[in-house]
Amino acid sequence: MPAIEIGRICVKTRGREAGKKCVIVDIIDENFVLVTGPKDVNKVKRRRVNILHLEPTDKKIDINKGASDDEVKKKLEEAGLIEFMKQDVKPKIPVI
């Protein structure tokens, strides 16, 4: 089970959206992925994110590569994960 894969739900650990959950929509290269909230669910915009700034969860939805926000929202509703996505989490950031 790869931790970084399309459809994996992750928690953002850095930036203004830290603590919010997102879904991996596409893998850009070995360092970056494309994620979305979707924005109308938990205010996480579709953007490129460094994988070091993500903490994968054990939850995954079945979406196609490059799925639209509407498709992601529909799959989240089918899986019953809308309320899970709206809950913020305190990210585990190691102290340097």
Curated annotation (Swiss-Prot):
This is Large ribosomal subunit protein eL14. Keywords: Ribonucleoprotein, Ribosomal protein. It comes from the Archaea. InterPro entries: KOW, Rib_uL2_dom2, Ribosomal_eL14, Ribosomal_eL14_arc, Translation_prot_SH3-like_sf. One of its GO terms (molecular function) is structural constituent of ribosome. Gene3D superfamilies: 2.30.30.30. It comes from Sulfurisphaera tokodaii (strain DSM 16993 / JCM 10545 / NBRC 100140 / 7) (Sulfolobus tokodaii). Coiled coil: none annotated. The keyword Ribonucleoprotein applies. Belongs to the eukaryotic ribosomal protein eL14 family. GO terms for biological process: ribosomal large subunit biogenesis; translation. GO terms for cellular component: cytosolic large ribosomal subunit.
